[in-house]
Amino acid sequence: MERFVLKFLLIDKVIAVCLDQKISNERLNPLTEYFFWPQRDAWEDMKNFIDNNDWIDPKDAVNILNRITEVINFWEESAQLKKEDIKNLNIKFPDCVFIVM
């Protein structure tokens, strides 16, 4: 997943995810809007986006969807994450960006 970055917004009882493409070490190109969970199925929304963009390598697609599953499961098991928990999230998922609202 070195060509992509998943960004997660943590908002009370909602988690949102979007996908960015790395252009360089410092620049990102947004590819999707934020997909929200549990109001909608963020995983399914991301899968639909990936399926409609055949330039995304299948291996990257699997890694992206697996990472979303891991983060959502961690978030659900943790009940309510606080700003202090960002450090733990960054350690557990160093390839993602987390923003607590």
UniProtKB/Swiss-Prot annotation:
GO CC terms, sorted: chloroplast; ribonucleoprotein complex; ribosome
Keywords assigned by UniProt, alphabetized: Chloroplast, Plastid, Ribonucleoprotein, Ribosomal protein
Coiled coil residues, start to end: none
Keyword Ribosomal protein: yes
A GO MF term: structural constituent of ribosome
One Pfam family in the UniProt entry: PSRP-3_Ycf65
Family assignment from sequence similarity: Belongs to the chloroplast-specific ribosomal protein cS23 family.
Function: Probably a ribosomal protein or a ribosome-associated protein.
Protein name: Small ribosomal subunit protein cS23
Origin species: Euglena mutabilis
